[in-house]
């Protein structure tokens, strides 16, 4: 019976380990970049608030600009219908 020290690692096994390590390191690097970007976005919103802008409205506009025009129009129609039903318009 061979001991673990005497067993030579197969090249395919070493390749898989190296590949896994590279993937994990890439994910960690991207997570750090994501945190940095989130901090930058938060700073921009703080700057906007300091200049008197309504941050909630800015966030709504940013979210709406990401939507497809048809999807946004449909959502606005539904919102308007609900507001009319509740006597808000």
UniProtKB/Swiss-Prot annotation:
GO molecular function annotations of the record: DNA binding
Pfam families reported for this sequence: GapR_DNA-bd
Domain of life: Bacteria
Coiled coil: none
Similarity annotation: Belongs to the UPF0335 family.
HAMAP family: UPF0335 (MF_00797)
NCBIfam families: PRK13694.1
Protein's recorded name: UPF0335 protein RPC_3979
Originating organism: Rhodopseudomonas palustris (strain BisB18)
Lineage: Bacteria, Pseudomonadati, Pseudomonadota, Alphaproteobacteria, Hyphomicrobiales
């Amino acid at each position: 019976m061979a001991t673990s020290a005497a067993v030579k690692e197969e090249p395919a096994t070493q390749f898989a380990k190296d590949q896994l390590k590279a993937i994990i390191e890439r994910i960690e690097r991207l997570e750090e970049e994501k945190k940095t970007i989130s901090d930058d976005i938060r700073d921009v919103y703080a700057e906007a608030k300091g200049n008197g802008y309504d941050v909630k409205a800015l966030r709504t506009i940013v979210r709406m600009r990401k939507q497809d025009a048809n999807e946004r129009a449909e959502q606005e129609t539904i919102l308007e219908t609900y507001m009319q039903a509740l006597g808000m318009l």
